[in-house]
Each structure stands twice: as structure tokens, then as C-alpha cells.
């Protein structure tokens, strides 16, 4: 049996349409693809693999987002290489079956293949987002590599939250293979034979200070090599003194920053700081968080609006990506406290 590839470029969890179909986020996706396609060519890869969550919203697809999606697929197709996609949970309309997906039109591209069910080829097994009790079949896999979109307990969902064990698939169920590469959790992490390769780029403040995102190059039989996209958006949480001492180190036109006020300042001073940081460094977002629980956040240069810390917490809850937590219920519980 011949190997599926000699050298593969692997990426995951692009989430086109995130941030309510933000144009800036879509532009970041386009910039990522510029970098990724150059990496594919530089590394002389013969295969491209995508491990799920091409789109973000599972029940609708914005026209502008779809336009960017098709353009990205067209660029991948034009590589002239074999490109294989599996759907993640965000790509599926139903939670209990894989019959409807927002990436079905991938099949119209000559060089791109959509793998909707477990499939083994060339000693590689592809496993899309698992449904129901499909996880029970994972122990039977004996391939050298598994490429999947798994939700495994004891791994970090983000830098702060570990996935609890709710039953279902466990890492031990995949011990029959040499190495597992998976999407779903966005933080790059390795434990045993399981590699969460990390998503394309940081998406929100759950990714603060965690810039190890980008893509993986896998030469058959060799250790994977991870490449960071150094021009990615970045999220920072820091205090005011820290920011003012070395703003050039922390702020640029790719930065989203939440700044804790560790000294007392007036609204006028806050306006001045925000205006100067925006003018000098072009930061995308700068929120000043006061100890008493108010947030000074920028709507326009020179204006200070208020946002509650509660909104920040609720935003973090809504960003949890797992089928085992009911985020609406968590938000209701938090609001009742």
C-alpha cells in the first residue's frame, strides 16, 4: 500500500464568518491564505489537508462570507495539488447527522475532495466530526496517521479551560495508531500520540498571549513541523503601566488589547491615552478596564463608552466550542448570580 502523501500541509479551524461576518476577520482569513499558500509552495508539499470548521455559523451562511469562502477554495484548487477536507461541527447543520453541510460546494472544485464519513487511504484515516456512538469504532483504527476533528477530555479548549470527561471518545481509544492530528480545540498542544495542531490564527481574548497558530508541515514518517503565522491578529491582556512603559512592544495594527487600570486616571486622561495609542500604533481595539468593574472601550477616537465586565464574561462563555456545555444555560446561570 502506497503512502497517501510525501509531504502534506495541514491547517484547521478557519471559521469564516466569525465575529458576525466581520469584514476585518474575513480579510484576516484572506491574509492567512496568502501566507499558507506561500508555505505550501516553499515547502514543496504535494498534498493539503484541512481538519474541519471552515465556516463558523452552522445554520446560515452570509453572502459576503460565502464569496470569500469560494475565493479561498478557488485558490486552493489552483495549487494543482490534491486537497482533502473533513467537516467540523461548525460545518454541519444538524448536530446528530452529517447529511447537510455548508461546505458541500467543495465537491465542485476539481482538486478538492470532501470526506463526509470515516475513510482510510494510503495508511491515513480521516474522521470528520463524530456523531452519536461512532466514537466506539475508533479503537479499530490501525492506520499510521489519523486526521480528525475530535473533542477529547483532558485537553485544553483554550488557554484556561480544560475539557472535562463526559464519556464518549477518549485519547486512549486512539492508541492503535502512530499519531493523531486533529482540529477543534484551537490551542496547539501535544499529549501522547495526539496533536491538536492549533487553528489558523487567534480569534478572541481566550487566545490572549498565545500566538502559536498557523499550520503544520508533515513529511511522511518524520516529526511534524509547526509554522507560526507571524502576521496574525494578536490578543493582549495587560495593565496600564505595562502598556505605557513599552507600547511599541505590545501594540500594533494587528492588536486587540484589554488594559487593566492599575493606576487611577480621569476620563479625559483615558480619552487621551486611547487617542494617542490609536494614532501612533493603529490598534484594532483598546479597552480600559477599571478595578470597580467598568470598562472604557473605544467606539470612536476621543469618545469613551461603557461596557460592563459582565459582558466580557458572557462573551467568553459564548466562545466555548463544545457540545457538552449548554452555553445559553451557563449564561442564564451567570446572569442569575
Residue ranges and their predicted role:
Residues 69, 87-172, 197-200, 221:
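Conserved catalytic scaffold of divalent metal-dependent phosphoesterases
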Residues 13, 33, 48, 53, ...:
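Divalent metal-coordination and catalytic microenvironments
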